[in-house]
Design a protein with these regions (language model features):
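Long beta-strand-rich cores associated with HINT superfamily self-processing modules
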Residues: 557-584
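Extracytoplasmic/peripheral linker and loop segments enriched in polar/acidic and small residues
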Residues: 37, 187, 342, 354-357, ...
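Structural transition elements
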Residues: 364-409, 430-436
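Extracellular/periplasmic solute-recognition and catalytic clefts
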Residues: 150, 240-250, 271-333, 351, ...
Length: 584
C-alpha cells in the first residue's frame, strides 16, 4: 500500500517519488508518549497541506496514513491490527468478527462470524449481506477505483474471455454474474457468517480483512462514486462536515464500546484542516500556537533539526525507520527505450537529494530494489541498482549514462529526441520542497543530455497517476508490503493484475517471462522457496528498469504539547491516530 505523508519525503528525495507501508515489524519503532492516563474530551486537530484526502470510501483507500486514520475513527473491518506500540501492533485481533477468521480446505475457504451489537451510524444492524455487498463493489472497477485488487484475483469467480471477472459489480444488472459472486462470497441463513471461496490457497487472507474492501456498506445508501464524499460510519465517529476547508468527525451515538474491543474514542471531535502551507504547519507546531494539533504529514526536511535537536520537543516527535521503498515508476508505454530509462537512473544525483532530505539521520539509505530490508524473509540486495551494484555511484555515473544515451540515439531515435528536446515529464505531488529539488534533478539529468519537465499535482495525486490516460512519463510512486510477504509487493507493482502497477509494463518484451515467474511464486506454499523467488523477481524487475528506486526510508512525526498517547503503529507505518487524546 502507498503512504501519503511519505510521498512528500520521496518528492524531496527524487523530486518525484512516493511511498507505501507494510505490516513488517519495524525494529526500534518507539512511543514518544509517556505512560499517562488518557483523558476524554476536546478537539484533536490534524493539519494537512493538500486540499482533501484522496478517498473516504473504505473500498478505495489504499494509503497507509489514510487507512490508519479512517480505520481508527470511522471504518470497522472484520479483522484489525492491534493498536499498541512495538511488534505486538502487527498482530491481528477480531474487529467486526468474533475471531480472526477460520480457514479450511487448505486455506481456500475462509469464514468470519460477525459479533452481535454492531451497527451503522443510522442504527441499522450490520449483517453478513452488508459485508457481502461491500465486497461486491470492488468489482465495479470503472466506478470503485484505486483500492486493493486482491479480491478480483483471489475469489473463485469465473473469468470472462478478456481475463476479467464475469461479475462486474452491483451497478451492472447481470443475474449470472451476481450468482457467480454469491457462490464465492456467501452468507449463512442467520446472516451472521460470511464465507469466502478462493481459487487458490491463501494462508494470510485474513490480513486482507483489515482493509475496507471487506467492510459493510448498505446497498440502499450506496451512491457509487459519490459514496466517496460521505460514507456511512461503523466506528466511534461519523462525518459532520466534509468541505473544502476541513473534514470534521463527531461522536457516533449509535456506536457501542461493548461491541468494539479495538477502539476507545477519546476526543469529542476529530478535525482535519486542509490547505495549510507546509512551512506554516511546522511553525504552528514549533511555536505551539495550536497545542492540540498534529502535523498530518511529516515536517519539512529543512525543519527537522529544529524539532530533533531541541530537548523541549522530546515528547512531541518521532523518528523511525519505516518499511517503505521509494522509487520513480517509469511509464513503460511512454518510455519503451530501456537505455533512456537506465540513463535516467545513472545520471541522477542520489547523494545530493539524500543530503538535502537529511541524510541517513532523517531520510534513510539508498534503495537496492522495491522489497524493503524490513521485510527480512524476502529481502536481499539486488546488486543491479544501489549499493552492491557494479555501476552505482551516489553522485551519478555520468560516463555510463552518456554511453546509454549514445546507444539510444540510434536504437530508439524518437525516444531519444523526446528525452533530449521535448523533455521527460515527471508527475509529483505539489510541495514547497520542489523549489529546491527541481534544480538538483534538472542539473543532474542534464549531464546526460536529458531534459525533464515536472508536473506538480496539488490534489488527488494517486487517482490522477493511476489513470493511464493521465499519467505522465514517470510518476512519484513507491510501495511497502501490505503485510509480511512480498506477494503483496512484486505482483502488486509489476503484474498485469496488480493493484498499483504504474509501470504499464505489459507490452515490454520481458514481461511475459516475468509474469510467469510471479504466478509460480504465488502458487508456492513453501514460504522459504517462495522467498527465494521473490528475491529473484526483484532482481529481474530492476534489470528491466520498470522503476527507478531511490531510498529505503525513515519517517518523522511531530505534534503539539497537549496531544497525548502518540506512538508509532508498526503495520500502518504511521502513528496510531485512534489512541491520541487531548490533554487540556
Amino acid at each position: 500500500m502507498s503512504n501519503v505523508s511519505a510521498l512528500r519525503r520521496a518528492v524531496v528525495i527524487t523530486a518525484a517519488s512516493a511511498l507505501a507501508v507494510s505490516a513488517v515489524m519495524v525494529a526500534g519503532a518507539t512511543s514518544a508518549a509517556a505512560a499517562v492516563t488518557p483523558k476524554t474530551g476536546g478537539i484533536l486537530t490534524f493539519l494537512e497541506h493538500t486540499p482533501r484526502l484522496d478517498h473516504y470510501d473504505p473500498s478505495r483507500i489504499y494509503t497507509g496514513r489514510d487507512l490508519a486514520f479512517m480505520n481508527s475513527f470511522m471504518t470497522r473491518t472484520l479483522v484489525a491490527y492491534n493498536p499498541v506500540p512495538g511488534a505486538a501492533g502487527a498482530n491481528l485481533v477480531p474487529d467486526l468478527a468474533t475471531n480472526t477468521g477460520v480457514p479450511s480446505n487448505a486455506a481456500k475457504t475462509w469464514k468470519f462470524t460477525l459479533r452481535p451489537g454492531t451497527t451503522f451510524e443510522d442504527g441499522k444492524k450490520i449483517t453478513c449481506e452488508d459485508v457481502q455487498y461491500g465486497v461486491s463493489r470492488v468489482f465495479a472497477t470503472d466506478v470503485i477505483t484505486d483500492g486493493p485488487g486482491y479480491l478480483q484475483v483471489w475469489l473463485d469467480i469465473p473469468k470472462a474471455a478478456d481475463g476479467t471477472s464475469v461479475f462486474k459489480g452491483p451497478y451492472v444488472k447481470d443475474a449470472a454474474g451476481l450468482a457467480a459472486f454469491k457462490k464465492a462470497v456467501s452468507c449463512s441463513k442467520d446472516n451472521r457468517t460470511i464465507t469466502f471461496q478462493l481459487n487458490k490457497s491463501v494462508a494470510d487472507f485474513n490480513y486482507l480483512a483489515t482493509y475496507g474492501v471487506i467492510s459493510p456498506v448498505q446497498a440502499k445508501l450506496d451512491k457509487g462514486d459519490k459514496y466517496d464524499l460521505w460514507p456511512q460510519s461503523t466506528g466511534p465517529y461519523k462525518i459532520a462536515e466534509n468541505s473544502k476547508t476541513q473534514l470534521k468527525l463527531v461522536r457516533n451515538a449509535k456506536w457501542s464500546k461493548a461491541s468494539d474491543p479495538v477502539r476507545t474514542p477519546y476526543p469529542d471531535e476529530v478535525v482535519i484542516m486542509f490547505g495549510y502551507d507546509e512551512e506554516v504547519i511546522d511553525q504552528i507546531i514549533l511555536g505551539d500556537t495550536i497545542p492540540t494539533a498534529v502535523n498530518f504529514a511529516e515536517p519539512l526536511s529543512t525543519n527537522n533539526d529544529k524539532f530533533f535537536s531541541d530537548p523541549k520537543f522530546a515528547k512531541q516527535r518521532m523518528n523511525n525507520p519505516d518499511p517503505y521503498a521509494r522509487y520513480l515508476a517509469f511509464n513503460v508505454k511512454a518510455m519503451p527505450c530501456i537505455e533512456i530509462r537506465q540513463a535516467m537512473y545513472y545520471s541522477r544525483n542520489a547523494k545530493a537529494l539524500l543530503d538535502y532530505a537529511g541524510g541517513s539521520t532523517y531520510a534513510g539509505s539508498y534503495a537496492t530494489g522495491v522489497i524493503s530490508p524490513l521485510l527480512a524473509t524476502d529481502y536481499a540486495p539486488t546488486k543491479v541498482v544501489g549499493p552492491g551494484s557494479a555501476d552505482f555511484i551516489p553522485e551519478g555515473n555520468i560516463p555510463k549514462a552518456l554511453a546509454l544515451m549514445e546507444t539510444a540515439k540510434t536504437k530508439c531515435p524518437a525516444d531519444y529526441k523526446k528525452a533530449t528536446e521535448t523533455g521527460i515529464k515527471i508527475d509529483t505531488r505539489q510541495s514547497v520542497t520542489l523549489n529546491d529539488t527541481i534544480p538538483i534533478d534538472t542539473a543532474a539529468y542534464a549531464r546526460a543530455g536529458i531534459k525533464v519537465v515536472f508536473n506538480p499535482i496539488s490534489s488527488g495525486y494517486y487517482p490522477t497517476v493511476m489513470n493511464p490516460a493521465k499519467q505522465s512519463d514517470l510518476s512519484a510512486s513507491g510501495w511497502g508490503a501490505d503485510w509480511a510477504n512480498a506477494s503483496t509487493v512484486i505482483p502488486e507493482l509489476f503484474a498485469s493484475f496488480g493493484g498499483f502497477n504504474l509501470s504499464q509494463n505489459g507490452s515490454d518484451p520481458a514481461y511475459a517471462a516475468f509474469e510467469k515467474g510471479v504466478n509460480t511464486a504465488m502458487l508456492s506454499t513453501d514460504r522459504k522457496k517462495q522467498a527465494v523467488m521473490w528475491k529473484a523477481l526483484d532482481v529481474q524487475a530492476m534489470k528491466n528498469f520498470w522503476v527507478l528506486p531511490t531510498i529505503f526510508g525513515k519517517a518523522q512525526f511531530v505534534w503539539g504539547s497537549q496531544v497525548g498517547g502518540v506512538f508509532f503503529w508498526v503495520p500502518q507505518g504511521n502513528p496510531a491516530f485512534g489512541k491520541m487524546w487531548v490533554n487540556n
